[in-house]
Design a protein with these regions (language model features):
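Small-residue-rich helix-loop
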Residues: 268-289
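GST superfamily/GST-like fold recognition
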Residues: 209-231
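All-alpha helical catalytic cores of prenyl diphosphate-utilizing isoprenoid enzymes
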Residues: 164-173, 180, 184-199
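GST-like domain detector, emphasizing the conserved glutathione-binding G-site
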Residues: 11-160, 211, 231-232, 285-408
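Short acidic alpha-helical/loop segments enriched in Asp/Glu that coordinate divalent cations
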Residues: 212-215, 233-244, 260-274
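A non-catalytic, amphipathic alpha-helix used as a structural packing/dimerization or gating element
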Residues: 110, 114-117, 189-196, 200, ...
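Inter-helical turn/loop segments and adjacent helix faces that build the functional surface
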Residues: 97-103, 180-185, 207-212, 233-240
Length: 408
């Protein structure tokens, strides 16, 4: 693949000598949901990079101490700068070094707001199907997952030890699935919901190569996290996608390539890479936004309410910290809410509020006329309240960690 080179092992040693023609180093893994959007962006924009697993010596001895926790993705630039988090990594390429082939943030207000909506939903709103279809289909998935997880182990283990290691790591991930609301009581609703998502996305892709037209934007890249790492690579869900929503599968494949991959949109390989005209939203995209409202609005609303109550109780919380004993901890508790006719409980993570703020900040930057247009579009999709849903402290990122800002 153009721009995706394998490099000599010397680059993975503890000391890396910066070179002007050196690649960027992406610390992540094929099974990682959050690495998926960054890898897609790098490939789609033909950026020279190599992917290194986060169990490498360089990652463990240098990256983890720098960012304060074992987490992926992380990026190391040729001059040695470390950037953690997919949103920050994409911002670096798009805003700072300006390596995007095409703008990933629309300039028109409604399209920009919608791209940030799917940034939030892509990263956080499809976790239930991603975890369910990975960890509740052992007959179809287990051999693949054992093989995938085994390549993350350094040094190489014997087969018996690999199985023990996989049992341990997969056990942790199965517990994580529960914290995202996956359980016997929710399985039927998760599968019904995901089938609806595939149907709606497929209908939209019948006339659009990407979410907002003829080129990918931020929302496309962020949807690639769950749609690639879990839902298209793992055997059980990819079989479902290929059987019931092959257009969605082709979108996933388009999002992994630099070269044009537009067989079903013949004009798009030669036509200008433009977005939908006049800041419009086709009915098929509005239907997808309504799905986001039904699927995720009750959850993020409950999380903000929980966080505000929690923050009110933390009378000694120091601004610039996460208010927890472990500075690298991501969750502040759990809360329950009504979802598709049942009640589920999920972990409350401030990182989600940081993504939500990106949508709200984009809205706040608009003039009154543009804000009215955004509100109208979101109201038509049942999502207007998300524009005003705020915690009493902003979430900030400092030294690669989520921290609370001052009281508002």
């Amino acid at each position: 693949m153009v721009g995706y080179q394998m490099l000599p092992p010397v680059l993975f040693n503890e000391t890396i000598i910066p070179m002007t023609d050196s690649p960027y180093i992406l610390y992540g893994g094929p099974v990682s949901l959050y690495t998926g959007k960054v890898r897609s962006y790098l490939r789609k924009n033909n950026i020279n990079f190599v992917e290194v697993h986060p169990n490498s010596e360089r990652y463990l001895k240098h990256i983890v101490p720098t960012v304060g926790r074992w987490i992926m993705p992380c990026l190391e630039t040729p001059d040695g700068r470390i950037i953690q988090d997919g949103a920050d990594i994409i911002d670096y390429f798009d805003n700072e070094v300006k390596l995007s082939r095409f703008p990933i943030r629309p300039t028109t207000p409604v399209h920009r707001a919608v791209s940030h909506l799917f940034e939030l939903f892509g990263g956080e709103g499809l976790l239930r199907p991603a975890m369910h279809y990975r960890w509740n289909f052992d007959e179809q998935n287990i051999a693949f997952l054992e093989s995938e997880f085994s390549i993350s182990v350094i040094p190489k283990m014997t087969e018996g030890k690999e199985q023990i290691n996989f049992a341990r790591s997969s056990g942790r991930m199965r517990k994580a699935a529960i914290t995202f609301g996956v359980g016997p009581h929710s399985v039927e609703a998760i599968e019904s919901s995901f089938a609806e998502w595939l149907e709606l996305f497929s209908a939209h892709l019948a006339n659009n190569a990407y979410l907002l037209g003829n080129r990918p934007t931020l929302g496309d890249y962020c949807l690639m996290g769950p749609m690639w790492a879990h839902l298209f690579r793992d055997p059980a869900p990819t079989a479902l996608i290929k059987k019931t929503a092959p257009r969605v599968g082709r979108w996933v494949e388009r999002m992994t390539t630099y070269e044009p991959y537009d067989g079903e949109h013949f004009e798009s390989s030669t036509a200008p890479r433009e977005l939908l005209a006049n800041d419009t939203l086709p009915d098929t995209l509005v239907a997808m936004m309504r799905f986001v409202a039904e699927e995720y609005l009750s959850e993020i609303t409950a999380h903000v309410e929980y966080a505000n109550n929690w923050l009110a109780e933390q009378t000694d919380l120091v601004t610039g910290t996460n208010g927890l004993p472990d500075p690298g901890a991501r969750g502040i508790g759990k809360t329950s809410f009504a979802w598709r006719g049942i009640e589920i409980e999920t972990a409350v993570m401030p990182y989600r509020f940081w993504l939500l703020q990106r949508l709200q900040d984009a809205f706040a930057e608009c003039d009154a006329t543009s804000q009215t247009a955004i509100r109208t579009a979101f109201r038509n999709a049942g999502l207007e309240s998300i524009l005003d849903l705020r915690t009493i402290r902003r979430v900030e990122r400092a030294n690669h960690l989520e921290v609370w800002g001052p009281l508002l």
